[in-house]
Swiss-Prot record:
Pfam families found in the cross-reference section: FeoA
Entry-linked SMART domains: FeoA
Domain of life from the UniProt record: Bacteria
The keyword Transcription regulation appears for this protein: no
Listed Gene3D superfamilies: 2.30.30.90
GO biological process: iron ion transport
Record keywords: Ion transport, Iron, Iron transport, Transport
Annotated function: Might be involved in Fe(2+) ion uptake.
Name the UniProt record assigns to this protein: Putative Fe(2+) transport protein A
Length: 82
């Protein structure tokens, strides 16, 4: 897992109620991961808010709340926002 950089952070490092804008989706994780994220409306430029980290990782995407598995979390990098 990559930590913070000038460009942003791994989604997994955000705490509940922190927001970010999706800046990168790791394509090395395969087409299935990218397709699954698209089906959840998570694409480059999408604003997301971490709602909960455990027992399930819940993310607010617009008006929707989605649960992300570890592989999906690992694929998302965000630029922090306030």
């Amino acid at each position: 897992m990559t930590g913070f950089t000038i460009e942003g952070s791994s989604l997994k490092l955000l705490k509940p109620q922190e927001q970010g804008v999706v800046s990168r989706i790791d394509s090395s994780r395969g087409d299935f991961v990218a397709q699954k994220l698209r089906s959840m409306n998570i694409t480059l430029g999408t604003r997301v808010t971490v709602e909960q980290r455990s027992p399930r990782f819940l993310l607010r995407v617009g008006a929707d709340q989605v649960a992300l598995s570890d592989p999906l979390q690992d694929a998302i990098y965000v630029r922090l926002s306030r």
